[in-house]
Each structure stands twice: as structure tokens, then as C-alpha cells.
A protein has these predicted regions:
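N-terminal subdomain of nucleotide-sugar transferases
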Residues: 1-65, 256, 417-418
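Conserved donor-binding/catalytic core segment of Leloir-type glycosyltransferases
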Residues: 207, 224-242, 248-251, 263
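A charged, aromatic-enriched C-terminal amphipathic alpha-helix characteristic of glycosyltransferases
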Residues: 219, 377-408
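Membrane-proximal helix-turn-helix segments that form the acceptor-binding/catalytic region
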Residues: 122, 129-133, 159-179
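Nucleotide-activated donor-binding/catalytic signature segment of Leloir-type glycosyltransferases, i.e.
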Residues: 229, 265, 272-299
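Carbohydrate-associated surface elements
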Residues: 44, 185, 203-206
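Short hydrophobic beta-strand element within catalytic cores of glycosyltransferases
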Residues: 307-310, 328-339
Length: 418
């Protein structure tokens, strides 16, 4: 259990929030359930489709309640589906809008500010503004390393812009009292941009509680998507970071193996590209692209799949990260097929939960997919059981939530920031 004490007033800053599917949603719910008063400063939901969710948008601030937490939404520009300019405007619009409006919208001083920092890193700027005005300490939970992620995804390559982003990153790290990282390998990249006194701590992601082994009813809707044979399922964002070119290459090499089905559940900027490639190469008998489903239904998709697929592009930054998808796969006790390297591949190997090919080797991914398709059911079950055991040992949700709660309380008890 975390250190007991009075309930805290916690401001959570993140550009994305429910109904967008990110780990910050569960963090808000858990902290609220533990008796704290949580306020979320976020934008209008438009991820991953690139258009605002029905009922949102416009240029007015919106307030709502979610699981007992107060949610403040500031106006932003939607990210669009394929325009780098719109994506850049989306990134900038939240940082500017929230930084200007937050001092007026967050009327009382929070005990502590938690930034759930995904891409872009600029989403942390409103927290720094509030720290300077109200004196609250900031805990920055780094999910993506910038500017490395910016270069790796190819969104911006201009060295002047990258240099400007690096300056902003230094500013954010300097003004964060605790920097938490979701992967231990992040530390060596953060240290040169942080100050010597920066307090950097390991805080991994954990799976939401609904990610668990489940029994699927005979009449469950999810069953209609699975055909007889060997089903490989990819879940989540279909974006540039996912290395879909490698996956497509593997599918093409196994085109004649009609017993192997590739199922994609999710949406994102590269969905249209993938659908076009499937049509172009005559892969409709091998591939299904289903679109997005509620996160709570994903364990049932996972249970029906023979293997779950995890892929990332061949970039240094992606070898350092642990995609939160991996924890959800492990928590459901399913074997994993990876086109990954670095930390994620190391976890998969240590857990004995599946096989991993290099991220840029479609022929190796195809070979491993074929190998797993020929494994006895008993062997696949062993891999799934090992995945679940590793998840419970290394990514226990209550343990790491206790750590987060303790650190937030620690900052709340320190002298006012200046």
C-alpha cells in the first residue's frame, strides 16, 4: 500500500483523455478511487481518427465529470489523417491553448501536478506554466523520448526545429521535480538533457484491470471475425511507428498459407495505406482490418487469437521503449509474436512468452509466424502462461500505483516551488 495521509488535490495534464484510449484514463480512475481529488487538463478528443469525436470540437472550453474526476477540455486543432502540417498544428494548439487558459481555468493551487507525457512533449508546457504561477511541484511521467521520437516518425526533420524542440525539452526536464520513465533505457537519453540534480525514477506502465484472461461465450460477437486456422491479431494504433511495412512484407511472403489469418483491430494514420496495400497485392483472403473496438472488448479478441502481434519501426528510440500494448498482451496470458528489438524484445525473451524477429526483417517475421503456426496447442499455452506470470511479477498494478501515489505525496509535502 502507498503511504497513508490526507487526500491530495492532483492536477493531471495530458493532451489525450477518454474517450481516447490511453493509460492516463486508468491512472485518473485509480487515483480518484483512492480518495484523491483529481482534475484533468486535456484537449478535445480526436485520436486516432483525426476528427473530433461527436459532440466535441469548437472553440469553447468544456467541463465535464468522468468517474468522479473533473475534466477541463481546451480548444485545439484536430490532427487530421495524413497531413504533417495539421499534426504539427494539433501539437502546438494544445500547448498554446492550455498554457494560456490553464491559469484561469485551474483556480485553486493543486497539491501536485502529474504530466502523463506522450507525444508531443510540448503537452507538458501548461504544467510548467502552472508551476511557475501557483507553485505546485511537477511529476513528469515520460512515455515518449523527444526529440528522438520526432525524428524517428519522420514528422519533422529540419535540424533547426529539432534543436528548438530540444531546448523546450531541457526546460521541461529542468522544471520537473521528479522525472519518471516507463523504460529503464530512457534514463541514459534523458540524463544529458536534464540537470545534474534531476531525480529520475523507473515507473513502468501496467495493464488496465480489465485486461485479463477471459472465457469467450459461444455466441460472442467477436467470434465472427475468426476463421478456422491460425489467427494472428494486431491490436492498437495503425501509425507510422508500428512498422507496418515489415508486417505487410511478412504477410506477402505467407500469402499462399491460407490457414494463417492476419487480423488488425484498431485505427490510425496508416490504416488507409494498409487497406490499399491489401487490395493492391490481393491479400483479402489473408487479412482482415476491422477498425477500432472498445478497449474493454479487447481481452475477448485476444482470447480468440492464437498469437498477438507487436511491431515497431527499426529506430533507436523504439528499441528503448516498452509499448504499453505489450503489458496488455502479457496480462491476458497470450503468446506474442514480435517484430521488435531492444527493451521490448528483451522482455519477451526473459518472459519466455513468444518469439521476436528484428523490426526490419519481414522474412524473419514470416518465418517465426510459420513456426508458431506449427506449434502444438500445449506449447502455445505454455507461452501464454509464462506471459501472464511475468506480467504479475514485473508489472503488478497495485505495486506501481502505490509508488506513484507515494511520489505524488512526497512532492506535495515539499516546500512550494519557485
Amino acid at each position: 500500500m502507498g503511504v497513508e495521509g490526507r487526500p491530495l488535490s492532483i492536477l493531471i495534464v495530458c493532451q489525450y483523455f477518454s474517450p481516447e484510449n490511453f493509460g492516463v484514463n486508468a491512472i485518473v480512475a485509480e487515483l480518484q478511487q483512492r480518495g484523491h481529488s483529481v482534475t484533468v487538463l486535456t484537449g478535445m478528443p480526436n485520436y486516432p481518427s483525426g476528427v473530433f469525436v461527436d459532440g466535441y470540437g469548437g472553440w469553447k472550453v468544456r467541463r465535464e465529470t468522468w468517474n468522479g474526476a473533473m475534466v477541463i477540455r481546451v480548444p485545439i486543432i484536430a490532427r487530421g489523417r495524413s497531413s504533417r502540417l495539421k499534426l504539427a498544428l494539433n501539437y502546438l494548439s494544445y500547448a498554446i491553448s492550455a498554457s494560456i487558459l490553464a491559469p484561469f481555468l485551474v483556480k485553486t493551487r493543486p497539491d501536485v501536478i502529474l504530466v502523463y507525457q506522450l507525444s508531443p512533449v510540448t503537452m507538458a508546457l501548461p504544467a510548467i506554466v502552472l508551476k511557475l504561477i501557483k507553485g505546485s511541484k511537477v511529476l513528469l511521467w515520460v512515455q515518449d523520448i523527444w526529440p528522438e521520437s520526432l525524428r524517428a516518425t519522420g514528422i519533422i526533420k529540419n535540424p533547426l526545429i529539432v534543436g528548438s524542440v530540444k531546448f523546450v525539452v531541457r526546460l521541461i526536464y529542468r522544471d520537473s521535480s521528479i522525472i519518471a520513465v516507463q523504460s529503464r533505457r530512457f534514463i541514459d537519453f534523458i540524463r544529458p538533457l536534464a540537470t545534474r540534480a534531476s531525480d529520475i525514477r523507473y515507473l513502468p506502465n501496467t495493464a488496465d484491470r480489465f485486461y485479463r484472461p477471459v472465457e469467450v461465450a459461444p455466441d460472442a460477437t467477436e467470434r465472427k471475425f475468426f476463421r478456422p486456422g491460425f489467427n494472428i491479431l494486431f491490436a492498437g494504433n495503425l501509425g507510422s511507428a508500428q512498422g507496418l511495412e515489415t508486417v505487410l512484407g511478412a504477410i506477402m511472403q505467407l500469402k499462399d498459407h491460407k490457414n494463417i489469418q492476419w487480423i488488425f483491430v484498431g485505427d490510425g494514420r496508416c490504416r488507409g495505406w494498409l487497406e490499399h496495400q491489401v487490395r493492391e497485392h490481393g491479400l483479402s483472403d489473408n487479412v482482415q482490418i476491422l477498425g477500432a473496438f472498445p478497449p474493454e472488448r479487447m481481452p475477448y479478441f485476444f482470447a480468440l487469437a492464437d498469437v498477438l502481434l507487436l511491431s515497431l519501426r527499426d529506430e533507436l528510440i523504439f528499441s528503448l521503449t516498452v509499448p504499453s500494448k505489450l503489458q496488455t498482451y502479457l496480462a491476458c496470458g497470450r503468446p506474442v509474436l514480435g517484430a521488435i528489438s531492444g527493451e521490448a524484445a528483451n522482455i519477451l525473451s526473459t518472459a519466455s512468452a513468444g518469439l521476436a524477429a528484428p523490426p526490419d526483417a519481414p522474412e524473419r517475421l514470416a518465418e517465426m509466424a510459420l513456426t508458431m503456426s506449427r506449434m502444438p496447442r500445449e506449447r502455445l499455452k505454455e507461452l501464454g502462461d509464462a506471459a501472464l506470470e511475468y506480467q504479475r511479477r514485473e508489472f503488478d498494478r497495485d505495486h506501481w500505483l502505490d509508488c506513484l501515489e507515494d511520489w505524488l505525496r512526497e512532492l506535495s509535502e515539499q516546500p512550494r516551488a519557485s
